[in-house]
Amino acid sequence: MLRLFVLRRENKVRVGLDIGSTTIKCVVLGEHDELLYSTYERHYSHILEKAQELLRRIDAEQLHGCKALLSISGSAGMGLADSCGVPFVQEVFSTRVAVKRFMPKTDCVIELGGEDAKILFLTNGTEVRMNGSCAGGTGAFIDQMATLLKMSADEMNKAAEQAQRTYTIASRCGVFAKSDVQPLINQGARTEDIAASIYKAVVNQTIAGLAQGRPIKGNILYLGGPLTFSTVLRKSFDEALNVTGTCPENSLLYVALGAALYADKEFVLTEVAAALDRYAATATYASEPPLFASKEEYETFHARHMSHSVPRV
C-alpha cells in the first residue's frame, strides 16, 4: 500500500488526511493525480500524536522539506484542522470528489465506517443519507458482535462463508443485537450461521434506515473498512439489492483522496506538525475532578461499603 518516490522541487503534490473515529488514512497524489503514497492505520484515540507522526514521516520519506498542498477530512479531523490552520473538507464532499474523479460512472455509493454509515445517490443530482448518531450497523457494531462470538472480525467473515441459514437479528443497536445473538449462542446455533446473520442485519439496517424506500440501482460502489475487508458483507449487499457492486482499488482511502484533490493551500508538513505541538501544549480541557484522590481513598470507600450487606433470607 506504500510506494516511495523521489520528489523534484518543482513538483506540486497533494496530501490528504482522513481522520476517522478509529483510523487515520493519508495519501500523497502526484501532479497527474496518481497515487504516490498511502497509509491506513488505527490511531487508538491518540489522534493528535498519530497525525504528527504521519506528517513528519511523509516529510522525511517523501517530501524532503518541500511544500505540498494539504487538507484534512474525516469525522475526527475538524478540530485538528482548526488547531493548525489547515483547510478542512467535509467527508461526504471528499467522497463525492474522489468518486467523480476516479469512478465517474458510479450511480450510488454505500460507505460503512467505524461508527457511521452513508449512502450517496449521485444520479439526478446528489443526495446524501447518513447515520452518524448511532454505531449500529457500522464497523464498531461488527467488532462488537465478533467479540461476542469470541473471534476477530476476519474470523467472523470466514465463518460466515460456511453458513447454511440465517436468523433475524436487530442491528439498530448493539444492545438489542446482543439480546438476539446471545440466545442463539445459548441454544447451540452454529457460529457460522450467526455470523452470516449479523452481516445480513447490517445490510438490512443500511438499506431500511438510510435508503428509506429510494431504489438503490445502477453502478454501486462499496467503500469503507467493513465493506473492504468482508467479502460476505459485500455479497449480502449484492443479494439484497440484486446488483453486482464494485469495491474499487484503494476503497479505504476515498475520503483521503478527495481531501487531497480538494487541497489548494501549501504547507511544509513539519511546520504543521510543530503547530500541533504548540496546540497540545496550550490546549485546555473542561473536566470534573476524580471521584477518588488516590487508590487508598478508593480502597477505604470499597471496604466501608463491603462491610454492609443485606441479610440473605
Regions found by a protein language model. Give the residues of each.
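Acidic, glycine/GT-rich loop-and beta-edge segments that sit at the periphery of enzyme/chaperone cores
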Residues: 1, 265-313
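Gly/Thr-rich phosphate-binding beta-strand-loop-beta motif of the actin/hexokinase/Hsp70
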Residues: 4-32, 106-123, 165, 313
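Adenine-nucleotide phosphate-binding core of ATP-dependent small-molecule kinases
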Residues: 177-210
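Glycine-rich phosphate-binding loops at beta-strand->alpha-helix junctions
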Residues: 76, 211-240, 251-255
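Glycine-rich phosphate-binding loop plus the immediately following alpha-helix
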Residues: 46-47, 124-165, 173, 252-255, ...
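Conserved phosphate-binding/catalytic loops in two-lobed NTP-binding clefts
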Residues: 88-92, 238-257
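Short beta-strand-loop/turn "lid" adjacent to the catalytic site in phosphate-handling enzymes
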Residues: 40-43, 58-93, 120-129
